[in-house]
């Protein structure tokens, strides 16, 4: 699952991951993740800076909830300086934009295979 308010990012990552064989779901509104009840993704790519919501707050919430705490979360941001705060929020990993697809795939494979 990809959550990013930039449609270009959603499309680009979605196309690349589908090409690699992943089933991809996405949302431009990170707040919708707060109401996940039935279908949980194998991994969540979550932008930190989205309109009206901070991805770190979503991450904290999901990591506190019993039903979602085991979902690996990779927080993504254009600011490399906030990696520490991303990890403090409970993220399993961090990726700085712009990134290489190989770096993204390595993080996805590491977390999906270990979960």
Label each PLM-derived region with a short phrase.
Residues 99-112:
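C-terminal output helix
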Residues 92:
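Short, glycine/charged-rich "phosphate-handling" switch motifs in NTP-dependent
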